[in-house]
Amino acid sequence: MPFRDLILFNLSKFLLTEDEESLEIVSSLCRGFEISYDDLITYFPDRKYHKYISKVFEHVDLSEELSMEFHDTTLRDLVYLRLYKYSKCIRPCYKLGDNLKGIVVIKDRNIYIREANDDLIEYLLKEYTPQIYTYSNERVPITGSKLILCGFSQVTFMAYTTSHITTNKKVDVLVSKKCIDELVDPINYQILQNLFDKGSGTINKILRKIFYSVTGGQTP
């Protein structure tokens, strides 16, 4: 594994989270491989990072022993950093009244309803006639489905990124520990790939490069 990737990964982590352990690792690697301040800012040209990068060379405590390999948790750390301070919300649809409550999952012509009040059921029967759609007691997979949320203020990142959500009130997209655990599951590799490919900005581009280096893929 190129030592520069280790430096860039830990420096990105420090710049995002101010993690002191990452700062110590970067400082130690830079001293050991004679990496200068000018070398680092070529990867981080944005001036807002420069005062933090200077701390790398002001740091006194250095690690006596350093691993030249990424840890087993690196992929999870990459996802955490990519979604660090993630902020997204879903705007309400004017067609859905404030009086509607419940969850509806629509996949093809199958409809699964949960915790719905009478107003929501009445709305569904008008919009999705039983002559065409099948109302089922069995859960319908969320992935690739249309999700109608009424009366909720939050939705998980996994639900947001794998389905088309319509809501009757503003909904915040939540990134949780469980969500990150699900994302690093090999079955969700395509979701991860899309997540890193869509990233813009200096640090996101570096995280994308390291993501493909760690997973063995080819950077687009």
UniProtKB/Swiss-Prot annotation:
Gene that specifies this protein: OPG087
Signal peptide feature range: none
Record key words, sorted: Early protein, Elongation factor, Protein biosynthesis
TM annotation in the entry: none
Expression induction: Expressed in the early phase of the viral replicative cycle.
Paired cysteines (S-S): none
Annotated protein name in UniProt: Late transcription elongation factor OPG087
Family the UniProt entry places it in: Belongs to the orthopoxvirus OPG087 family.
Subunit structure: Interacts with H5 and A18. Might be part of a transcription complex composed at least of OPG087/G2, OPG145/A18, and OPG110/H5.
Lineage, opening ranks: Viruses, Varidnaviria, Bamfordvirae, Nucleocytoviricota, Pokkesviricetes
Function, as annotated: Involved in postreplicative transcription elongation on intermediate and late genes.
InterPro entries on file: Chordopox_G2
